[in-house]
Every structure is written in structure tokens, then in C-alpha cells.
Regions:
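N-terminal signal peptide c-region/cleavage motif recognized by signal peptidases
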Residues: 14-16
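Aromatic-lined carbohydrate-binding/catalytic grooves of carbohydrate-active enzymes
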Residues: 43, 47, 51-165
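Aromatic-lined carbohydrate-recognition surfaces of secreted/lumenal glycan-active proteins
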Residues: 104-122, 183-202
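Glycan-recognition surfaces
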Residues: 135, 185-186, 190-280
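Carbohydrate-binding surface patches
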Residues: 268-271, 276-278, 314-356, 385, ...
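Extracytoplasmic
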Residues: 345, 354-365, 379-537
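Residue-level detector of functionally pivotal "anchor" positions at catalytic/ligand-binding pockets or at interdomain
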Residues: 399-403, 533-561
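C-terminal tail/sorting-segment detector
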Residues: 572-582
Length: 582
């Protein structure tokens, strides 16, 4: 019966895609990458036509977003927005209506300050004085009540003092919060706002926007795509239902190689970025269209758990990223083996590092007929600038033991202001750390702490917590579990490029736990990782004599390599997802 159930599960795995949520990252098309400010009513309508006729709507792409370039200044008497008479001679509402008639959603653009980016960098003078600043409610009413738009991208060129000619010094939190309130005042609760500030704004953004840009503008080059991926590797803790790290509009189908296009789209999918196509849909290449319509990849992006894949390992220069699908802490997961290097790499993937035990059935999300089975480890060769993405179903789910610092949450984290002056923690590249990153500049306030909010324990109980830290002088870490302070540790690893460890015993409750590292008064050490391992008393549960008997073939017993065995062997075994000692 066990084999039959596994076979049935594999059939389901290979013939269905992940459950699609209603609040997943925005999917659609945006005008900026191809057209810049040189847009028109006919161009926008043509993209809506193509989205439907080419089958993109059928796989989930449902937004047509008008970016910068439609402005015509403001009325001198009452300040209402004027629309470019040549590019949009009939105004915006007929265009939005046309998009809606196609069964699609319509998006628009503005700036949090006075002037748009196009007015500054593209010579589009009609974009001066047209931003939200001074007109928050007036413009929100026009966009969302009068025209019926469903999405808005709000730039910050007019709000940043080093960009705008007025030298306005506007506060990002104040401006985006005010605009969000103006949208709320329209009575619309379904509008998605994207905050385009070109860096992670701060954790306050959750209360203002549906998504937010995390980097500078993308361009159609591998270095740009690679850099954006690198900056988002450590942002998984800031992604949740209705709140997404925006890796910028897609450059797929423009000038990247076929392999780079696959990596670009695949990583945007598994990392839960919004998916906004940037090429001209009217002339899209068949190869590009086939990639963008790959349902198995889209399902990863729109999965109902709303997770961004997190870094689980760095092997031979390649990153392993993983996330749950359909069920938290279940046996179905998606993982990527990402090769940012300029040469092909062969990687030995230890499935236990992905918390997958026993026989693992998987398929390549790019080539669904490429089905694999593996126990313990499997080998994959990844092209230069490439990625292999798999959807996997395991016989058993192992408890996660390694939590990298770059998967933790810092409540003060932001990338806009000088973090040292603000005393806010950040994530930094560090080649001496286990996955190439660390969390640093932590402490000096209770809020500036590092915490993992998703430490799962199947049964609860006693665990060994090991902290990998970096500190060239004596500093303290206060360890808290589920809001209760456990212990304060004095740490000194003997150098700022040397990882030291401290181990203590903690108690976890059954289910989800939060582990927090803090120092309310002074700087604390930089953090590489934590290990969380069950201990009873040595990190392993003892097997009682009655457990030596396997009563039926459904008992889940494995050796440490993940191979299923009929009876526990001498030493450490895995029984029903827990390490036990015979």
C-alpha cells in the first residue's frame, strides 16, 4: 500500500501545478522597458490584444500597465491632471475601459514627488509638476474612481533630493503612507500599489504597498540580472501574502541569451517577484512566449503559501534555494540550483539540506518530462548563468536544522539611509560565511535584532541551539525563544573574518517558534547562521525496544543518507522525521 500511495502522489505531482493563491505577485505587462516615455493609446491597446490572443491571459498574466509618458501637465485653475493630447487623444479612461473589456486589469504610473523620472532623464517636459505631491487625493480619485485603474507604480524621482530640480527632501515613509491612505479614501480596496524606491525601503512598507522595488532599474544584461538576484537572496523573510519584493520588470525576450532568459524568468518565479513582461507582445518570439507560458514555473510564483525561496546552501559556487509548496512543512517543495558563474558547474545536492528524506520524486520545471528519483543525494550539471528548478515530493519531511542569517528578519532593516548612522542592521556579502552572507550592524536597540519566525518543531521539546557568529572583540548576544529571554552570551571569535560558535539548550513548543538574537544597549556580533538540533539528551531520541519491531510497511524508517530501511540500524536513524539512536 505504501508504494501505491507514493506512486499516486507522484502522478499527482507530475500532472498538476501548485495551488494558485488569489493574492500572489502581480502578473502582466508594463510599457517602460521597451517604449520608455514613447507610448500611445494604440500601443497600449495593441499589448492588451496580444496578451489575450497569444494565450498569456490564460496562464495568469492579467495586468496592462501604463508607465511614464502619458502626462500633459496640470490644469492651471484647479490643478487636475492633463493627458498628453498626441499620445492619448481620447484620455486615459477609454484606454482603461478597453483593457477591462478584454478581461484584464489596468495599471497606471505616478511619482511621490512633483516630477516624474521621464521628465528628468528622458526629456519629457510634460512630466513636470504631475506627481502626487500636493495632489494626493485629487490624483487618487482621478486614477481609481474616475478612470478605474487597478494598479499603480509610484516612483520617487520627484521625492529624492539628488534627483529632483526642486531639491525637495521628502520622507519615503510619509509619502508612500499618505498615498496609500489617499487610495484607501477612494473606497477601493482592490488597488495594488508598487513603491518604486530602487532599494528596500524598510519594514514599514508592508503597511503601504503590495510590492516594492529592491534595486536600481534592470537592464537587458546578465550583470544586471545577476546583481538583482544577489540583492534579493537575503530578502525571503520580507515576503508574505500580499507583500512582495519586486525584482523589477522582466527583460525576457530582449537581448539576453536563451539560458539567461530561463534563469531570469525562473528565479523571478521561485523568488516570488511580480512578473511584468517588458518586451513588445505584438512581436514576441515563440521561444520567449513558450517560456513565459510555462505553467510549472508560474505555479511556483503564484503558490498559495506566498513564500519566497530562501538560501539553503552554497555548493561549488552554486546557490541552493528552496520553499514549501501547498502545505507548510509538508513533503512537497520547490528548489533551485542557481549558477551565477561564467562556467558550467556540477553540484552534488544533499537532499537533507533541503529537508527532504527517503525516496524523493522530482521533475525539472523547465522540462517536465525530465523526471528523477533520488535518495540521499543527486548530481546536477548547471550551465553558466543557468538554473535548474525542481518540484519535489519526498517520502518524509525532515526538520530544518540550519537557518542562515540571511533568512532571518531584522525589524529595522532598510537600504535607503546610512545604516551605521541609523543603527539599523543589514545583510552583507562575506565569502568566509557558510552561504556567502552574514547579518551585521545589529544591536544598540531592542528593535535592531535578528530573528527567525519560522523555526518548526514537530513535537516540541529540548534542542541544542548553536550560533555561528563573527566578532573581533567581546560582545554580548541575548537569546530569546518565543518572547522569553533564555540567556545572554559573551562572544569573541578572535577576528572579524573568523566564525566562532556558541551552543546552549533551549525549549521549543510544538509547531512554529521564534528565535531572536539581540543586544538592546550595545553592538552585538555579526551572525552567520544558527543550527537548531533536537537533543534528548544528545540531539537524538533514544529508541525503545518496542520500536525495533516494524509492524507494517508504512513505518517511515531511514538511515542518515535518506535510504529507507526495514529495521533501525545501529547508530543514528530517522524515524517519522526525527533522528533517533539505537
Amino acid at each position: 500500500m505504501a508504494r501505491l500511495r507514493i506512486a499516486q502522489a507522484v502522478v499527482a505531482l507530475l500532472t498538476t501545478v501548485a495551488a494558485v493563491g488569489q493574492d500572489g505577485p502581480t502578473m502582466g505587462w508594463s510599457s517602460w522597458n521597451t517604449f520608455g516615455v514613447n507610448i500611445s493609446e494604440s500601443i497600449i491597446k495593441g499589448q492588451a490584444d496580444a496578451m489575450v490572443s497569444k494565450g498569456l491571459k490564460d496562464v495568469g498574466f492579467d495586468h496592462i500597465n501604463i508607465d511614464d509618458g502619458y502626462f500633459g501637465g496640470r490644469d492651471k485653475d484647479d490643478g487636475h491632471l492633463l493627458i498628453h493630447a498626441t499620445r492619448f487623444p481620447n484620455g486615459l479612461k477609454p484606454v482603461a475601459d478597453y483593457i477591462h473589456e478584454k478581461g484584464l486589469k489596468a495599471g497606471i504610473y505616478s511619482d511621490a514627488g512633483r516630477n516624474t523620472c521621464g521628465s528628468m532623464f528622458n526629456g519629457d517636459v510634460t512630466g513636470k509638476g504631475v506627481g502626487f505631491y500636493g495632489h494626493d487625493q485629487q490624483d487618487a480619485d482621478f486614477f481609481f474612481k474616475d478612470c478605474g485603474f487597478d494598479f499603480i507604480k509610484v516612483d520617487f524621482c520627484g521625492g529624492s533630493y539628488y534627483h529632483n530640480e526642486d531639491h525637495l527632501v521628502l520622507d519615503e515613509q510619509e509619502r508612500y503612507t499618505a498615498i496609500a491612505q489617499a487610495i484607501k479614501n477612494t473606497g477601493r480596496t482592490d488597488v495594488r500599489m508598487n513603491a518604486c524606491r530602487w532599494a528596500y525601503p524598510g519594514t514599514w512598507i508592508d503597511n503601504a504597498a503590495f510590492s516594492w522595488r529592491t534595486t536600481g532599474d534592470i537592464n537587458s544584461s546578465w550583470e544586471s540580472v545577476k546583481g538583482i538576484i544577489a540583492e534579493n537572496l537575503y530578502l525571503s523573510a520580507y515576503c508574505s501574502k500580499g507583500h512582495y519584493n519586486d525584482m523589477d520588470m522582466l527583460e525576457v525576450g530582449r537581448s539576453l541569451t536563451s539560458e539567461e532568459d530561463k534563469t531570469h524568468f525562473g528565479m523571478w518565479c521561485i523568488m516570488n517577484s511580480p512578473l511584468l513582461i517588458g518586451c513588445d507582445l505584438r512581436n514576441i518570439k515563440q521561444e520567449t512566449l513558450t517560456l513565459l507560458k510555462k505553467k510549472e514555473l508560474i505555479a511556483l510564483n503564484q503558490d498559495s503559501l506566498y513564500q519566497q525561496a530562501y538560501v539553503a546552501g552554497l555548493v561549488n559556487g552554486c546557490f541552493l534555494l528552496v520553499k514549501d509548496l501547498e502545505e507548510l512543512n509538508g513533503t512537497k517543495r520547490a528548489f533551485a540550483v542557481y549558477n551565477p558563474n561564467d562556467v558550467q558547474k556540477t553540484v552534488q545536492v544533499n537532499l537533507a539540506d533541503l529537508d527532504l528524506g527517503g525516496l524523493v520524486k522530482m521533475y525539472n520545471a523547465f522540462i517536465t518530462r525530465n523526471k528523477k528519483e533520488a535518495t540521499g543525494t543527486f548530481e546536477v550539471t548547471v550551465p553558466a548563468h543557468g538554473v535548474c528548478i525542481y518540484v519535489a515530493e519526498a517520502e518524509t519531511r525532515l526538520e530544518r536544522t540550519r537557518y542562515e542569517a540571511e533568512t532571518g528578519y531584522i525589524s529595522t532593516y532598510q537600504e535607503i539611509k546610512n545604516n551605521q548612522a541609523e543603527k539599523t542592521g543589514i545583510y552583507e556579502a562575506a565569502d568566509f560565511c557558510s552561504c556567502g552572507y552574514k547579518a551585521g550592524w545589529l544591536g544598540c536597540s531592542e528593535a535592531n535584532a535578528l530573528e527567525w519566525r519560522n523555526v518548526y518543531s514537530k513535537d516540541g521539546g529540548e534542542y541544542n541551539l548553536t550560533i555561528g557568529y563573527i566578532c573581533g572583540e567581546s560582545r554580548n548576544i541575548t537569546v530569546s525563544v518565543n518572547g522569553e529571554k533564555v540567556k545572554t552570551l559573551s562572544c569573541n571569535s578572535g577576528g572579524w573574518q573568523k566564525v566562532g560558535t556558541k551552543t546552549l539548550t533551549i525549549q521549543l513548543q510544538q509547531g512554529q517558534n521564534t528565535i531572536r538574537l539581540s543586544n538592546a544597549t550595545n553592538w552585538m556580533p555579526d551572525i552567520d547562521y544558527i543550527n537548531v538540533v533536537s537533543t534528548n539528551p544528545s540531539g537524538i531520541d533514544p529508541i525503545h525496544n518496542s520500536q525495533f519491531i516494524i509492524h507494517n510497511e508504512d513505518d517511515a524508517v531511514y538511515d542518515l543518507s535518506g535510504r529507507k530501511v526495514t529495521t533501525p540500524r545501529k547508530g543514528i536513524n530517522i524515524i517519522n522525521g526525527r533522528k533517533v539512536l539505537k
